[in-house]
Amino acid sequence: MRNYPGSLHNHTDFSNIRLRDCINKIPDLINYAIELGHEVVAITDHETLSSFIQVEEYAEKIKEKHPDFKVIRGNEIYLTRNNLNAQNVNKDKGDDYYHFVLLAKDIEGYHQLCELSTRAWLRSYVARRMRRVPTYYRDLKEIILPNQGHLIGSSACLGGRLPRYFLQYFETENPEYRDVAKRWCVYMRDLFGEGNFYLELQPSHNPQQIFVNKQLLEISNELGIPYIITTDSHYLKKTDADIHEKYLNSQDGDREVKSFYASTYMMSTEELESYFPYLSPAQFETAYNNIRAIAAACQNYSIKRPLRIPHLPWLAYNHNVANIEFYLNKMPSLRKFLASKRSADPELVYAVIDGIQRHQDLQNDEAYEALEECLDMTWISSEVNNAEWSAYYLNLQKIIGECWNAGTIVGPARGSGGGFVLLYCLDIIQMNKLREHTKLFPWRFLNPARVSVLDVDVDISGLKRGQVLQHLRAVYGEDRVSNVSTFRTEKSKSAILTAARGLDLPPEEGQYLASLVNAERGQLFSLHTMYYGDENDNIPPSSTFIEEMNKHPDVWEVAQKIEGLICGLGIHAGGVVFNDEPFTNTASLMRAPDGTIVSGFELHDLEKCSLIKYDLLSVECMDKIQICLELLQQYGFIDSSKTLKETYENVIGVYNIDRTSEDMWKMVWEHKITSLFQMEQQSGIQAIAKTHPTSVDDLATINSVIRLMAQEKGGESPIDKYARFREHPEQWEEEMTQYGLTTEEKKILHKELDISCGLSIAQEQFMELVQMPEIGGFDLQWSDRLRKSIAKKSPKDYEQLTKEFYENMRQKHLSEHLCSYVWQVLIAMNRGYGFNIRPTMQ
């Protein structure tokens, strides 16, 4: 009995990044292919390789259960004549964006796909309301011909060049079109190499497709070019056709999709063959054997690579340090770096010494001790993670210097890096934690026990972002710098709106139905949660939502199917990737809708193939500061002869600005300072009015407190409790007394929490508390588990940690009063939202 091996031309929702096209998700497509008894499936989205990591990971996931099933990765490109662009396109002369399918046989084939896709996207342009991504014939010739045998090509659907020749023959009966089609086939066979070009038949009752299929069979016999049968799947099952139609029509109601996509779904052998009454059993067997031959020729290669920090150009450091032994003795870890075989490690030694010599506030034993701690953690993490973190630091040091050179101011510090003195030493941040009152911990930035990529938030002026990126490309290379892409998805609300549009409901009706979706802290509930509730998070079903969806079963059906689908391409808020080799050695590049160059992979997939991002965040308040400085210079209020960095440091540098000015703090209280960082919202304005901060530490605390929620509905809000304890410190004393704390136990908490008036309002605070011997003596790894359970709002994990916390208390005979107060009052407050404190140290 014959068995259709599987379709080598299929789409997933990654095909939606330019135009709504497909409702298949990767797991569903692969699972259904297996369910149908197929042996292979190829994923060939419309001019994008963005699914490749996720496809590989899902193929790995099913490998144990289905070891013989093969997943092939490819790309459906738009093949055009050479030099086609928006200005010279002429459909009357046959110009169009002809579909053509490419399959990668191995890792070299993948690299060729990366180069082809990148060329198409970088030359792309907007025409007829969508971005066009043309691949020229010369691209195929330049990339494939010198190194044949790594890519397989097939002629694609009716939108392909070869089928179009046949359709012209069908419409005119002019044999010249058939002759041109034959010559085109010979050209492609020679270009790809023997056995690497295939003719593609597709199932359809459409007379045009049937004619093309028959012509392909004849050409195959005449030229000896093999043929295959594919389904060009845009949805999974025949029963999904209506949902697919509604999804496509939600974007353009005039699209004729019913007939065009009538048979573009996954099929069983029996259903597939029913579309081909004109094929003999032998012809089916030939097509199926050709599919198996392609599957056998395609390797199970991996594009994932271990983390590798690029070696970008670094600053030049003085290697002739006269008193180097002094520094090696003060910071013994430097000796390991100096002797290391990792090339960046010795350079870091000289960079650190250079930084100490430039920073007077680092020339003391406390600073040497703090730097030694950072260096030791860096060394351990580099060894454990096999990552050259020294290169990361040196890269970032120069990148920030180039940002200044490009004409933007750079923010002093934000994120967990504020607690890492080494970053201050290297001028990556401008804040020395040793000079601040709020306790900041280096392990929040780099925890040797945690395998994760380092991340420093660098704030720049959004107004200067374009020129900054242009400057960075000039310094590091046009093909070495890229923004990080993001992919928009259909969230629950947008899924309802999209479904309503596709079903041609009145706009106000769709808006009403979408408005019924609830959210918590900015996160929309899923459709499933709205309809069925979520027992784990104690969220009941919404009776109103259920009632309305039952009134609109068609909306409910369509919305469920499209929720979660990728529906567009975007740009990461700050992520920029730097490389020390051409991007196409690792991944492809694309353009966002506004033309910005972005990576072919989103952030997490980039990291899986060895690339890491550096965060250059555009911040509105930085724009205003920069404009103010420029105006002050322009009108002669400050010296205009100095560099931007010198001016910034002299006028408003972290340790030059007067932080104690009573007039300034009065302006803060009265909301007369615009764009006060992260205090612009009403919650921040109200919190400042209630508490009257007088220091940056106060602002940092307030910013953390306003993100927390009351533990009980209707209970006292954390900001009200903070204001109360701040004005009446004795009330904190009374609360501790009520929990039975002794004077000594109160002293322990005063030491840690006086800065925040008795509240544990940040992740590092409660992590530090549970590590204290009197409270738990837990290690950093356990406290990080606690952080994750709170940050990810995981009740199950938190419940397990609660058991471990109290069991540890009993085993170590710790104070039940102190431990209970810490767990039930201080830590519990963070369960609404555990924020880290450094964002507001800016």
Where are these regions (language model features)?
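Alpha-helical scaffold/interaction cores of sigma-54-like transcription cofactors
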Residues: 1-842
